[in-house]
Curated annotation (Swiss-Prot):
Subcellular location per the Swiss-Prot or TrEMBL entry: Cytoplasm
Gene Ontology annotations for the cellular component aspect, listed alphabetically: cytoplasm
Organism lineage string: Bacteria, Pseudomonadati, Pseudomonadota, Betaproteobacteria, Burkholderiales
Residues at the active site: K166
EC number(s) stated in the UniProt entry for this protein: 2.1.1.166
Organism: Bordetella avium (strain 197N)
UniProt keyword Transferase, yes or no: yes
Protein name per the record: Ribosomal RNA large subunit methyltransferase E
Gene: rlmE
Length: 219
């Protein structure tokens, strides 16, 4: 009975969520689009010509936002967007999507092959592992996903590149923040208005690598 009530409450909340309604009006595939929009505006990120990697992209709302901001004359993308997710994603014009598990070495190598020698301006990650409800196990899964995004970013970002990653408050969060601060000069925490009040999610915005692998002139 409690589970059924929870389901009804969630449906009621979802239907009456202003961001759900706004996403439908704007044509975004998910309300999460507004989380990224706010972060990009506050941090003054993303310009035409940028190379962006979207990790955990399905259903595609973040890629939609990036595409809008990189669109030039005629709606053609001025830049590059590479998206990856474990789940399938309906095509978005100008977005290079492929399906796979980012935790799989073969998938990671394929992503790196697609990026090639192009230095990345922005990595965005809305990835979240399946949670079991067991605190220690869930914290380890969350940290692992964040670490993977961090390592990829450190290897492929421009020196002044930026990583936006979803994390969750709780056990292990401080360790995630510390690992980001060891690699980036500036790390801030953002809780967009579109994040639900009861959610423990937060977004880390890390910029300016301390020890960049790629040269600024790499294209």
């Amino acid at each position: 009975m409690a589970k059924k009530k929870f389901s009804k409450d969630w449906i009621h909340q979802h239907i009456n969520d202003p961001y759900v309604k706004l996403a439908q009006q704007k044509g975004y595939r998910a309300r999460a689009a507004f989380k990224l929009i706010e972060i990009l505006e506050v941090e003054k990120l993303l310009k035409k010509g940028d190379v962006v990697v979207d990790l955990g992209s399905a259903p595609g709302s973040w890629s939609q936002v990036v595409r809008e901001r990189l669109a030039g004359p005629g709606g053609v993308v001025d830049g590059r967007i590479i998206a990856l997710d474990l789940l399938p994603m309906e095509p978005i014009a100008g977005v290079e999507f492929f399906q796979g598990d980012f935790r799989d070495d073969e998938v990671l190598h394929e992503l790196e092959r697609r990026v090639g020698n192009h230095a990345v301006d922005l990595v965005i990650s809305d990835m979240a592992p399946n949670l079991s409800g067991v605190g220690v196990a869930d914290s380890a899964r969350i940290q692992h996903v964040c670490d993977l995004a961090l390592e990829f970013s450190c290897a492929h970002l421009k020196p002044n590149g930026v990583l936006i990653v979803k994390a969750f408050h709780g056990s292990g969060f401080s360790q995630i923040v510390q690992s980001f601060k060891q690699r980036f000069k500036r790390v801030v925490e953002r809780k967009p208005k579109a994040s639900r009040d009861k959610s423990s999610e937060t977004f880390l915005v890390a910029r300016d690598l301390k020890d960049p692998v790629l040269n600024q002139t790499t294209e």
